[in-house]
């Protein structure tokens, strides 16, 4: 393999293996137990979501004491989550033909407003049934409509009458 610029991207830097890069794992000092304990105490995990590799919720035994305002805020968040879950379940029961992902998207697009979500889903339901009336049984690239509407027949008849009347399209110059 040639060293130098690549023909694909002449501005790309040459590849340097991980072991030869500055600050690689080989060059670092082994971590002591005391250093690990200091880092562990500095990180405060976000309970309930397993952030920072701490696993899942650790319960109230490990959580630090919280101020009353934090407890009220957390209680409000839990109530909002519960309300959102109940709204989603209601929508899933009301619109069984839609996926949970679709309902979630519509609900979040309406800023978690249940009434607006129901209105939007009703509109989508109406439009989808109207569209189904015009769809053929099978969709194929070669499909040609079998029924020609009256207005298109009249247009075709009118254009054929003008060409058969002996009037020819004359070249008109715009000079």
UniProtKB/Swiss-Prot annotation:
Highest taxon of source: Eukaryota
Record-linked InterPro entries: CID5/6/7_CUE (IPR041806), CID5/CID6 (IPR038981), CUE (IPR003892)
Region annotated Disordered, chain positions: 145-175
PROSITE patterns with a match to the protein in the record: CUE
Domain CUE: 83-126
Bias kind Polar residues: ranges: 166-175
CDD domains per record: CUE_CID7_like
Motif (PAM2-like): 7-17
Domain comment quoted from the record: Contains a PAM2-like motif, which seems to be involved in the binding to the PABC/CTC domain of PAB proteins.
Protein name: Polyadenylate-binding protein-interacting protein 6
Organism field: Arabidopsis thaliana (Mouse-ear cress)
Organism ancestry: Eukaryota, Viridiplantae, Streptophyta, Embryophyta, Tracheophyta
